[in-house]
């Protein structure tokens, strides 16, 4: 299957490379990766509305589990909405995504993977079960992989900024 639903465990919501780097660094990385990939979706080849998608591997053990960042993949909005299909479904149920858009996304999955609706439904159910199992794990550590140094630089810059602004507020 070229296009898969990849649901992020609940304890890891908002713990993303994008958040760790900050918007400016994330945008710079995303644009560099898009240029490297010919400004095309790494899954379906579309050139429309490209996103940076974090690809993670999860290692669950008793105690502390680990989320390992494998890569940042450039993908289109359709593939991105499929990767996070539980979120997409919530937006659909809230009326934020139209029935036409929701149906088009399901069709996109079937077209990219050359499968039937039943296979999509089964894949989604398996993804939800995996998500539920992983979400029960409360303690997680993050391995930023090849992005570790970039995360450390961003963290140091934020700390330096916070310290300089704290000193300013004390002197005014």
Where are these regions (language model features)?
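Histidine-centered nuclease catalytic patch
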Residues: 42-74, 83-95
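Extended charged
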Residues: 1-28, 47, 81-172
């Amino acid at each position: 299957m070229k296009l898969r639903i990849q649901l992020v465990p609940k304890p890891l919501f908002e713990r993303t490379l994008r958040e760790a780097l900050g918007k400016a660094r994330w945008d710079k990385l995303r644009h560099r990766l898009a240029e490297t990939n010919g400004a095309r979706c790494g899954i379906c080849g579309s050139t429309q509305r490209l996103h940076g998608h974090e690809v993670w591997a999860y290692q669950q053990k008793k105690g502390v589990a680990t989320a390992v960042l494998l890569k940042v993949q450039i993908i289109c909005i359709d593939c991105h909405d499929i990767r996070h299909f539980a979120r997409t479904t919530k937006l659909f149920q809230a009326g934020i995504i139209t029935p036409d858009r929701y149906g088009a996304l399901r069709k996109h999955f079937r077209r990219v993977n050359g499968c039937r609706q039943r296979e999509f439904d089964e894949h989604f159910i398996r993804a939800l079960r995996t998500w539920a199992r992983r979400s029960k794990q409360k303690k997680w550590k993050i391995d930023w992989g090849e992005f570790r140094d970039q995360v450390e630089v961003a963290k140091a810059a934020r700390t330096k900024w916070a310290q300089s602004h704290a000193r300013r507020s004390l002197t005014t």
